[in-house]
Structures are given as structure tokens and as C-alpha cells.
């Protein structure tokens, strides 16, 4: 005779309703919740350690610290790797890779990376040509995200733009803003 899962008492996961199973299940849940809460702090500690390494000019070690977090989608790590490629810190300077890493981070709402994307579009380095519409777009998004320097960059770029370009940029800003900053 098969015992229904609701009455099963073999794994201590609290499935059967017995007190000892519920207590063991509660302990497992507490461990899970604790790890869930601590995981971001561990990632933050790794990022801060990488920043410290960068300040000590230990760029290769910093890259080793950042790489797993960046590959897992951490926007701070992605932005720092973008900085490293943009400036040739511990890696050969590569504007295309720098832009790609900045863009990954920017699409997750990282204001510093958004300014980096704006700068690359403004200058056109590593890109086929400058694109003032997209430069302005990313500077505005960066300012919305809280980068205090982005407003200055935005003011400089808008001086070089036509009314038509500004209008197109505002269309893009409206498109991105809803997605990147749904509560602002």
C-alpha cells in the first residue's frame, strides 16, 4: 500500500504535519531564507574587495574577483569590468568590450554605466560613429538614476543637437524610463 505524500514522514520536510517534521522543515526554511538574505551581501563584499584591489593597482586580481559576479549578472561588477576595459586596467584597452560591459550594466539600471554608455555614444569610440541621440538618452537616464555628473554631460550634448534629434531622444527616454525606472 502506498502512503500519500501528505502523510509521508521520511524526509523531515514538514509534509506530514507531525511536530518533529514541521520543526525540521522550519529549520530548513530558516537556513534557506538566511542564505537568500546573505547572498547579496556576499556578492557586495566581493565587489568591495575588488574595488580595494583596484585602488591598490592589483587589477588582474580584481578582474578575477569581478568575473564570476559579472557573469552572474551583477550590474556593479559589469560596470567595473567596463571601466577596466575602457581604461586598460589589467587588461588590454578594448573600447568594444568596454561598451558591451557598460551596456549590460546600464540595462539593469546602473547610473554610472549609463553615463559610460552615453559617453561612448557621444564620442563614438569603439562604435561606427557618434550618436548624439543615444548619448543624450543615456545621460538623461543616468541622471534619473541618480548620477550627479550626468546632468552636466546631458547639457553639453544637447548644445550639439537639432530639435529633431532632441525629440527622437525623448521618445527613446520615454521607452527606456518605463522599463528601467518603473517607479520614478
Predicted feature residues:
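Short helix-capping/linker turns of helical repeat alpha-solenoids
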Residues: 8, 12, 58, 71-74, ...
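Terminal, low-structured helical/coil segments at or just beyond the last alpha-helical repeat
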Residues: 5, 11-15, 20, 149-184
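Positively charged n-region of N-terminal signal peptides that target proteins for export
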Residues: 25, 29-32
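N-terminal signal peptide c-region/cleavage motif recognized by signal peptidases
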Residues: 40-42
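Hydrophobic face of amphipathic alpha-helices that form TPR/SEL1-like repeat modules
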Residues: 47-53, 65, 69, 80-87, ...
Amino acid at each position: 500500500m502506498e502512503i500519500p505524500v501528505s502523510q509521508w514522514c521520511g524526509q523531515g520536510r514538514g509534509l506530514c504535519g507531525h511536530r518533529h517534521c514541521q520543526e525540521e522543515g522550519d529549520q530548513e526554511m530558516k537556513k534557506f531564507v538566511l542564505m537568500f538574505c546573505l547572498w547579496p551581501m556576499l556578492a557586495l563584499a566581493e565587489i568591495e574587495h575588488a574595488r580595494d584591489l583596484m585602488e591598490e593597482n592589483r587589477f588582474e586580481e580584481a578582474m578575477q574577483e569581478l568575473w564570476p559576479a559579472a557573469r552572474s549578472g551583477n550590474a556593479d561588477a559589469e560596470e567595473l569590468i567596463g571601466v577596466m576595459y575602457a581604461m586598460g586596467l589589467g587588461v588590454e584597452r578594448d573600447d568594444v568590450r568596454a561598451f558591451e560591459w557598460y551596456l549590460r550594466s546600464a540595462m539593469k539600471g546602473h547610473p554610472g554605466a549609463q553615463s559610460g554608455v552615453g559617453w561612448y555614444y557621444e564620442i563614438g569610440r569603439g562604435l561606427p560613429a557618434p550618436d548624439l541621440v543615444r548619448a543624450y538618452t543615456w545621460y538623461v537616464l543616468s541622471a534619473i538614476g541618480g548620477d550627479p555628473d550626468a546632468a552636466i554631460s546631458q547639457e553639453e550634448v544637447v548644445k550639439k543637437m537639432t530639435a529633431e534629434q532632441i525629440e527622437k531622444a525623448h521618445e527613446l527616454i520615454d521607452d527606456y524610463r518605463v522599463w528601467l525606472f518603473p517607479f520614478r
